[in-house]
Amino acid sequence: MSRESLFREAFTVVLEPVTPVHVWGGREAVIGIDALVHGNELILINFEETLKKAPEDVLRRFTTLLRSARPEEATASFLKELKSRELISGLRIPIKTKSRIEPNSRVRILHEYIIPGSELKGYIRTGIIKGLLKEIPNANKIIADGIDLEKEAKNVGLGIEALLLRSPRPRKQGGFVDALSIISVSDPLAYEQVERSLRELRVVHTSRLDHVASLLAITFSRGRLKYEVTIRRIEKPRLTSRPHERNVIEEVENTLEKINNLANKIGSKNWLLNTLRKFGCDLIKIELNKIKGTTKLRNYEDLLSRLEKDLCSENTSCVPARIGFMTGHESKTIIPEIKNYDPRIYDEVKTRMQQELSRFWDALTLKLVEVDEDLFGVGWCKICVE
């Protein structure tokens, strides 16, 4: 066995959407400016290619308009004329919403990697932290010590992660070592039969399904993404020291031991798979409890029940997951986990976040997307370890 294989474990992870998934790439398109509706398709305009196709008379009129009208008005007129001549170049996305798409509507653009490795690693990280909390006897103390209500709302639980995962660097270096830095997740290495679609993502009240908010987004609706997940083990160096350096050496050794203990645990595919399975299946249970008996969501309830039946037994190499935008606190943070250990602290965090974010508490809403005239939760997918 090579030296490298002793300290490195790598395996392939395949991700498939079960319902449309959206990971925002940070860009928006505006209908009539850099995107057009053409029949049942959205065209994300490639201006470089479109300008190459544009006839000289149209370009002259566009240039004249730019001198006398606002740029967005001139652009809209220019594109309208090119559209009528079928001269628009760009990525064409099927429109899968019945909602009217008005001029100047904004569309959130899917990330260029669809679901980047950083998004998948963030989900895995949250699952591991929840798994570790379930295994340690002093979880209540870690939660009590780790919550900081003085921090920005989204960061109130970072202290819990620090207590579980961080070790101080040797005193002269300062700072901390995050034990989960041993995990790396590549961006997708293969894209298989990928389908994108434009859909309306909705936030509704859990009890009445009343509208709270909505937006248009390009989603990943079908296909397979392949990633490489790598777990590194750090070789414990042979350290010799003078007596006055012994404390520093012990700090280094303790830090490496903590990191490698975690690496040994995570490096077991069974442990990682079972941890992510528990995480995903808990998410299914939480959502089923929210929607149980809601007539309009019966097909969604059936879908989750099938996922639970197919993927929540320990003899499968695939697990359910919920990833991306509008998937709720449960899938992105450890805050909902606090309720299981200390309801009082959970209520304090809930109150703090509601005050700062000025919106309905996450657990009181559902995030839905229309698929073939039915409503389903956004972001459900299947993760398989090969």
Regions found by a protein language model. Name each.
Residues 1-386:
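Basic, Gly/Ser/Thr-rich N-terminal segments that form RNA-phosphate-binding interfaces in CRISPR RAMP
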